[in-house]
Amino acid sequence: MSLRFEEKVVLVTGGSRGLGRAFTQCLADAGARVVFSSTGQSTTGAQVEKEMRQAGADVVHLPIVAEEAERLVEQVVSKCGRIDAIIHNGGFVQDKTLRKMSDQQWQAVMGVHLEAAFKLSRTAWPHFETVGGGRLVFISSSAGLYGNFGQANYAAAKLGLYGLARTIELEGAAVNIGANVVAPFGATELNSANMDEDRKAVLRPEYVAPIVAYLAHRECPESGGLFEASAGSFKKVRWQQSAGLILDTSQPVGIDDVAAGWASVCDFTAPSYPSEMRESLRGLYEPHLLSD
């Protein structure tokens, strides 16, 4: 089987350099018509478009920032007649410890990562329905999964993408619209200054791109998934719930009861793996129903 993207149009935000360029190249190599966006603050996007087109790729560069999500999607449809998938990779950081972070720094980072993802999805939705479905891939970060010092805004936005994708999974299932999240790590010009050449070779961005392209393909059945990817390794991440502390609610439940049973709250020797909200909630209240 060879998964191809002929006659499909894919938008890649932040697609002119680093991981984004690798996504653009991978999709173009698979036959997609790729529209990639950049801030337009340099000539990089235009140069990448020229180089890739000379090599035979069907690519279009749009110097439109991700925050202008509605205009970006409408430009893609205007130029290409359709849109089949979106890879939301564009963004930036404005790092500061929480105590020193300004409202502007918080809002700017939330805007380019999370709010843009929402607006891209909402604007593309009717166009996806017109062509029989669509795929959304939101590029997250290990900072979103695990937190990172000085990146409260970035971490919150990047984990927020997962909640957005899970909701799109539920709302889009009936119309063949799916969404997934990938937290990649690759060597780029922004993070590789202190890397040795061996590490750079292992962490090439093109070793991450295939999972992003697969999740953007119409034949990929996955939706609502969260994945980590680096150096040709691809792993799915899921929630784990401890067996927990189950107190007798026929008696008053107090702070001291929770404190005394804290080891049970945090005991993962016999965990469950809820995959949806109802399943998680049942794990909390059903033990009481079964004991009645």
Language-model-detected regions and their locations in the chain:
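Active-site helix of classical SDR
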Residues: S121, A157, A165
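Conserved glycine-rich cofactor-binding loop
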Residues: V9, S16-R17
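Substrate-binding pocket helix/loop in short-chain dehydrogenase/reductase
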Residues: T97-L98, S102-Q107
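Conserved glycine-rich Rossmann-like NAD(P)H-binding loop of the short-chain dehydrogenase/reductase
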Residues: A32-A46
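Residue(s) in the substrate-gating loop at a strand-loop-helix junction
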Residues: S141
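Conserved amphipathic alpha-helix within the SDR
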Residues: E49, V60-P63, E67-G81
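C-terminal helical subdomain
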Residues: L72, V181, R199-L290
